[in-house]
A protein has these predicted regions:
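Bacterial Sec-dependent signal peptides at the C-terminal "C-region" and cleavage site
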Residues: 20-30
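Short, flexible, mixed-charge acidic loops at enzyme active sites
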Residues: 31-34, 76-81
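Sequence/structural segment immediately N-terminal to covalent heme-attachment motifs in c-type
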Residues: 49-72, 78, 102-108
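Extracytoplasmic electron-transfer domains, predominantly the class I c-type cytochrome c fold
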Residues: 80-135
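Bacterial N-terminal signal peptides that target proteins for export
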Residues: 2-11
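Electrostatic cytochrome c docking/interface patches
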Residues: 28-58, 142-143, 147-149
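Bacterial N-terminal signal peptides
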Residues: 11-18
Length: 149
């Protein structure tokens, strides 16, 4: 016959296993819903060399400690957070997000990422959107006259 203590221990083991399984199966960052209207926003800031340089300085000050200098999510503080910072150099993720969605995420934040709406101006946040686009590796250029596979 199972004692009350055994039942309690068994329940804790099952609960712990369920928590570990949910973390292991990658449920951490699949959904970060953005309002439809926010995703439709267009970037009013041009990606000029001056704006990109300003955004790089902001990124190095506000973002690189977590997301890493090149955006791989490997900054010196990345290991302190659960879930870990996203790789901003992930082409499939970044190319799937319109500028308005990136801007909204920078603006609103989500634990553990802070909101930057009171730390950075609208222009600075849009500059960051342009800079983040530069972190995504470009596909190799096709050679003229190359045969398609």
């Amino acid at each position: 016959m199972m004692t009350r203590k055994s039942a309690m221990i068994g329940s804790l083991v099952v609960l712990g296993a369920a928590l570990l399984l949910s973390r292991w199966t990658g449920t951490r960052d699949k959904d970060w819903p953005v309002p439809v209207e926010a995703a439709k926003l267009k970037n009013p800031v041009k990606a000029t060399p001056e704006n990109l340089a300003a955004a790089r300085a902001i990124y190095m000050d506000k973002c690189a400690n977590c997301h890493g200098e090149k955006g791989f999510g490997d900054g010196p503080e990345a290991g302190m957070y659960d879930p870990p910072p996203a790789s901003l150099a992930d082409a499939s993720m970044m190319n799937g997000m319109p500028d308005g969605e990136i801007y909204w995420k920078i603006t609103e934040g989500r634990k553990p990422m802070p909101s930057f709406k009171n730390q950075l101006s609208d222009e600075q946040r849009w500059q960051l959107v342009n800079f983040l686009r530069t972190l995504v590796p470009k596909p190799p250029a096709k050679k003229p006259g190359a045969i398609k596979p």
